Design a protein with these regions (language model features):
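Generic structural signal for well-ordered beta-strand positions
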Residues: 176, 359-360
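A short, sequence-level motif marking secondary-structure junctions
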Residues: 180-186, 350-351, 366-367
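Cleft-lining beta-strand/loop regions that shape enzyme active-site pockets
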Residues: 115, 124, 138, 149-329, ...
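Short acidic, Pro/Gly- and aromatic-enriched capping/linker segments at domain boundaries
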Residues: 338-340, 344-350
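Flexible, low-complexity junctional segments that flank or bridge functional domains
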Residues: 1-229
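Conserved helicase C-terminal RecA-like lobe
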Residues: 367-400
C-alpha cells in the first residue's frame, strides 16, 4: 500500500513476500558512501582504460541507483527512472496506453500472472486470458523482473505501437505468442449493477485517484434504485492508494464508533507504525454512512489497500467477508520524487486494522470460505449468476 509524498501502492500492485530484512533489536549499518565513491571512481578508471565498447553513462548511473535499492532486500523498495515515474503517475489517473489487462505477481515464485482482462481491451482481442503467465515480452524473458518494471518498461508504451507477448498456459502446457496493439485504456476502477433481491453489486479493480468519486457515485445510484443489501467485490484488487481506501471506508462507516481506544472517540479506520513506533492514525470524518448489510468478496490476490478496506469493515462487523484468504500485504510504501524526474518507492511502515491486527504475511481469513469454481478461473467474463462466489455472498447476506 502506498501513501503519498507523492505516495502510492500497487497494484497492485504488485505483491511480494516480506519486509526489509532487519530483525527487531538490530541496528542497520549504513553504507560508507565515501568508500563507495572511491571504489566507483576506481572502477570507472578501469572502464575508461580497458573497456572494449562504448559506455552508456546514463544506463550505468541508473543501474547504480537501482542496485542501491535492490541491496535493501525488499521487493517493494525500488528506484524509478523519470520515464518510469511518469508512467506510474499516469496510471493513477485511471488512463494509460497499454493492453488492458490486470497482472499480479506471486510472492513466492515471482511469476507474473494475468488475473483480469478488461472487456473491449486489445488484450482480450488478442486472446489473452486470466491465468496466463507472462513469459516473454518481445525478446526479453521477464523472470525476475518486478511487477512495476514489467508493466512500466515493457507492457505499457506509445499508443498505436505493437508489443509481442508470450504467455504460458499451465492447463494445456503450451506457450502462446500474441501481438497486441497498445491503445489508450480508460479503465473505470468501479463497476456497479443491481442484482436480484435489490442487491447492489460494486466491483473495485484498484484504489486510484479516481476511485473514490466513482465508488461514491455507484453507491448513491444503487441507493436511489432501492438497494437493500450490497456486495463489494475486491477479488484480484492489488491495492493502490491508502488515502482512497480510507475515504471509501469513511463513506460507509459512521463517524462516532468508539469500539477501539486508539480512535480516541472517533471511528478508527487504520493506523500505521514505522520502525520507531511512530505513525499516522486515520479516522472517519465525512458524516456519511451506508446503512445496509454488506458482503465483501476477496481472494488470494486481494492485497494492500484492499485489505485495509476489508479489515476495517470486518473489525466493526459491518461486513461479512466471503471468498478465500487475502494476500497478506500489510506494509506501506512511500513514493518519493528525487527532484530530477526520477523517484524511489520505499517501505516505511506496517499498517494495522482497527483491532490492532497485523495482517502482513497472514492475510484476512473470510467468514465464509469458498473457492471459485475451477471452470470459471480462466474465463474473462463471468456473470454474477454463474459466479459461485457471488452467489455465496448472496446467501451470506440472507443469513446475516
Amino acid at each position: 500500500i502506498t501513501g503519498r509524498k507523492v505516495i502510492r501502492t500497487e497494484q497492485s500492485s504488485g505483491t511480494g513476500n516480506g519486509a526489509p530484512g532487519i530483525t527487531d533489536g538490530e541496528k542497520a549499518s549504513k553504507p560508507d558512501l565515501k568508500k563507495v565513491s572511491s571504489k566507483m571512481q576506481m572502477i570507472q578508471s578501469i572502464i575508461d582504460q580497458v573497456f572494449l565498447y562504448d559506455e552508456d553513462a546514463t544506463e550505468v548511473e541508473e543501474y547504480i541507483y537501482r542496485g542501491m535499492m535492490a541491496g535493501l532486500n525488499d521487493p517493494y523498495s525500488v528506484y524509478y527512472t523519470a520515464e518510469d515515474y511518469k508512467a506510474i503517475q499516469e496510471s493513477t489517473d485511471g488512463s494509460y496506453s497499454g493492453i488492458g489487462a490486470m497482472i499480479s505477481q506471486n510472492k513466492t515464485t515471482g511469476l507474473c500472472t494475468v488475473v483480469k482482462v478488461f472487456e473491449g481491451s486489445p488484450a482480450l482481442e488478442a486472446g489473452m486470458k486470466p491465468g496466463d503467465i507472462i513469459y516473454k515480452v518481445g525478446d526479453t524473458l521477464v523472470a525476475g523482473e518486478s511487477l512495476d518494471v514489467l508493466v512500466s518498461n515493457y507492457i505499457k508504451g506509445k499508443e498505436g505501437t505493437d508489443v509481442q507477448i508470450t504467455v504460458y498456459r499451465a492447463e494445456s502446457d503450451t506457450y502462446e505468442d500474441m501481438t497486441i496493439t497498445r491503445r489508450k485504456i480508460e479503465v473505470p476502477t468501479v463497476e456497479s449493477k443491481m442484482l436480484a433481491d435489490n442487491t447492489g453489486y460494486v466491483a473495485v479493480s484498484e484504489f486510484d485517484a479516481v476511485t473514490v468519486e466513482q465508488f461514491e457515485k455507484a453507491i448513491d445510484e444503487l441507493e436511489n434504485q432501492g438497494m437493500k443489501q450490497m456486495i463489494i467485490d475486491l477479488r484480484s484488487n492489488p491495492g493502490g492508494m491508502l488515502d482512497s481506501a480510507v475515504a471509501m471506508v469513511d463513506y460507509i462507516l459512521p463517524d462516532d464508533r468508539k469500539d477501539f481506544e486508539k480512535g480516541e472517540g472517533k471511528t478508527l479506520i487504520v493506523y500505521t507504525a514505522d520502525k520507531n513506533g511512530k505513525g499516522d492514525t486515520y479516522t472517519a470524518a465525512d458524516g456519511h454512512e451506508v446503512d445496509v448489510p454488506i458482503a465483501i468478496l476477496v481472494n488470494e490476490n486481494s492485497a494492500s489497500a484492499s485489505e485495509v478496506f476489508t479489515g476495517a469493515l470486518k473489525d466493526y462487523k459491518k461486513a461479512v467477508v466471503v471468498g478465500t484468504t487475502s494476500y497478506g500485504k500489510g506494509i506501506v510504501q512511500n513514493l518519493i520524487p528525487l527532484g530530477d524526474g526520477s523517484a524511489i518507492k520505499i517501505t516505511t511502515a506496517h499498517y494495522y486494522t482497527p483491532s490492532g491486527f497485523d495482517l502482513h504475511g497472514k492475510g484476512i481469513t473470510p467468514d465464509v470460505e469458498v473457492e471459485l469454481d475451477e471452470n470459471l478461473k480462466s474465463q474473462s467474463v463471468v456473470t454474477p449468476e454463474e459466479d459461485n462466489q457471488v452467489q455465496a455472498a448472496m446467501e451470506a447476506l440472507k443469513e446475516n
